[in-house]
Amino acid sequence: MWKWEAENDAKGVVVIAHNILEHTGRYAYVITMLRRNGYHVIMGDLPGQGQTSRANKGQIENFQTYHESLLDWLKIANEYKILTYVLGVGLGGLILLNLLEKVELPIEGMMLISPMLELQKNGKNRKDKLVSNIGKISKDTRFNVGVEPKDLTRNLEIVEETVNDGLMLKKATYHWYNTINETMKDTMAHIHDIQPMPTLLMYGTKDLIVDTRAIDEFKEKYQTPELYFKAWQGFYHEVHNEPERDEVMRYILTFLNNSVNTMGFIVEDDEIVEI
C-alpha cells in the first residue's frame, strides 16, 4: 500500500481500488491529477496482482480477501480525518459495491469507472461454459484470461506500455474466475442494499471487457439522491486511459469538488489544475 499526499491544502482523500490483472503503477496520471488538485491518494495492489505474493498470482481464496484490503486502506485514509472517497475501476468497482451491500463504510462518496458487474460474452472470455464442462478441477489450475492490451484503451501509448509491463497478469485460476462470476451475480441481486451516497458512474460505450447493460441496470436500481452519470461515446474499458483522459479527469475532479463544496470546502469553478 502507498500514500501520496496532495501538493497543496487537502480537500479530501481518495482510495483507489484497481482493476483485474493490473497494478498500482498504471495509475500515475490519475494519482498526479488528484494530488495537484488537492486530494491525498491511498492505493495498493489487490491480492494476487502487482507486487503481491508471486505464489498467489491470479488467485484468491475468497472474495472477502479483497474486502479486507479495501477496509485496510480506508482505515488509513480515515486517519487524515478529512472527507474520504473511493474510486473503483472494473474489479475495484465490484469490490466496493459488494462490500457496500454488506456494511456501511465511512466515506462521503464513490466513483465507479466501468464497474465489473457482468463480463462481455464473446469467444475470448466466455469461460463459464468451459468451466462448467470441466467439472471438478484444481482451484490452482490457471487459464489465459484473454484480455488483450488493445482491448482496454484506444490510447496506443498506453497499449504499448501495457504490452511491455511485466507486472500485468495474463493468467488466473478457474477458482478466481468462478469467484468473480458468483460475486457479480450476488452483487446485481442486492443492489437495493447499497447505502445511498453521492456517486459518479462512468463507462465507455465501446467497452470490450464488461457488459455495459449490467451497468445501466445498476444505474436504474441503485437508489441515491445524487448520481452523476457519463457514458463516454466511443471509449473503451479504461476511460481514464483514453486519448481524451484529460476530459475524464476533469469530470472526476468536478464531481469531487462539487461534493467537498457541499460539505463546506469552498472550491472555485476554474480551480482544476491540468498536467
Task: Kindly label every feature range from the protein language model.
Residues L201-Y203, D207:
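Short beta-strand/loop motif that positions the catalytic acidic residue
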Residues V89-L167, K171-A172:
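Alpha/beta-hydrolase-fold enzymes
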Residues N78-G90:
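Alpha/beta-hydrolase fold nucleophile elbow
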Residues D211-E220:
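Short alpha-helix in the alpha/beta-hydrolase fold that links the catalytic acid
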Residues L21-H23, G50-Y80:
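Catalytic nucleophile-loop/oxyanion-hole region of alpha/beta-hydrolase
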Residues R26, I31-A55:
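Conserved alpha/beta-hydrolase
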Residues K11-N19:
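Short beta-strand element of the alpha/beta-hydrolase
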Residues E226-I275:
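Catalytic active-site module of serine/aspartate enzymes centered on a nucleophile-bearing elbow/loop
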